[in-house]
C-alpha cells in the first residue's frame, strides 16, 4: 500500500514532525511538505529521500501559514497513493483533492480556536492606528474558520493524539474522533 503523509513544514523539528518521521519510516510512506531542513532530519537518523517539497514558503507568520494552506489546498496527487495521512493543521486542506484520507490531529489551529483571545491580546501588535491590527486579525480569524470548516468536510476520518485534543476537535469543529497516542 502506497501512503503519503502531509505536514505543514519540516524546517523546525519538534514533536509533531518527529512523529511524522517515525510514521513515514514505519509505514514506508512519503512525506509531502513545504520548507525542509534535510540536515536536521538526517542528524536525527532519518532518511530524506522520501520527503518532497511542494514549494518553498515564507518563514514568518502569518504569511507562512497562509502559503502552506494554499500549497496543500492545490495539491492533487491523483492516484499516486492508496491512502493519505494529513498530519498538520495547515496541511488539512490537502484533504480536498486527496482521498481516501485520515487527519491525525495534533491540535485544531490554536490561533483560531482555544488560543485566539490570548494571541489577539498579547501577540498581535497595536501599532499604527489604535487596535487596527487586532481588527484585521479578527477578520482573518473569521475567514480562516470559515475555510477550515469547509475543508474539514473533505476529511474522511479523524484521529487525535490525546483526550484533550479529541475534546477540542469536538468543541471547535463538531466532529467525533478516535485516539491513537503517539
Specify the residue positions occupied by each region the protein language model found.
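Active-site donor-binding segments of glycosyltransferases and PAPS-dependent sulfotransferases
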Residues: 30-92
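Active-site proximal beta-strand in glycosyltransferases
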Residues: 83-85, 96-129, 159, 178
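Helix-loop-beta element that forms the nucleotide-linked donor phosphate-binding surface
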Residues: 160-161, 166-182
Amino acid at each position: 500500500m502506497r501512503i503519503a503523509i502531509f505536514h505543514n513544514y519540516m524546517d523546525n523539528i519538534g514533536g509533531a514532525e518527529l512523529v511524522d518521521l517515525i510514521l513515514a519510516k514505519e509505514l514506508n510512506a512519503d512525506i509531502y511538505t513545504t520548507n525542509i531542513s534535510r540536515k536536521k532530519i538526517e542528524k536525527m537518523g532519518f532518511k530524506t529521500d522520501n520527503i518532497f517539497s511542494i514549494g518553498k514558503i515564507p518563514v514568518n507568520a502569518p504569511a507562512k501559514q497562509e502559503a502552506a494552506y494554499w500549497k496543500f489546498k492545490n495539491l492533487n496527487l491523483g492516484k499516486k497513493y492508496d491512502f493519505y495521512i494529513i498530519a498538520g493543521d495547515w496541511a488539512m486542506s490537502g484533504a480536498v483533492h486527496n482521498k481516501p484520507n485520515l487527519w491525525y490531529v495534533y491540535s485544531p489551529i490554536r490561533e483560531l480556536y482555544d488560543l485566539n483571545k490570548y494571541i489577539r491580546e498579547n501577540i498581535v501588535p497595536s501599532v499604527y492606528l489604535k487596535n487596527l491590527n487586532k481588527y484585521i486579525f479578527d477578520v482573518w480569524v473569521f475567514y480562516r474558520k470559515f475555510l477550515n470548516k469547509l475543508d474539514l468536510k473533505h476529511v474522511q476520518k479523524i484521529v487525535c493524539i490525546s483526550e484533550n485534543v479529541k475534546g477540542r476537535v469536538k468543541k471547535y469543529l463538531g466532529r467525533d474522533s478516535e485516539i491513537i497516542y503517539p
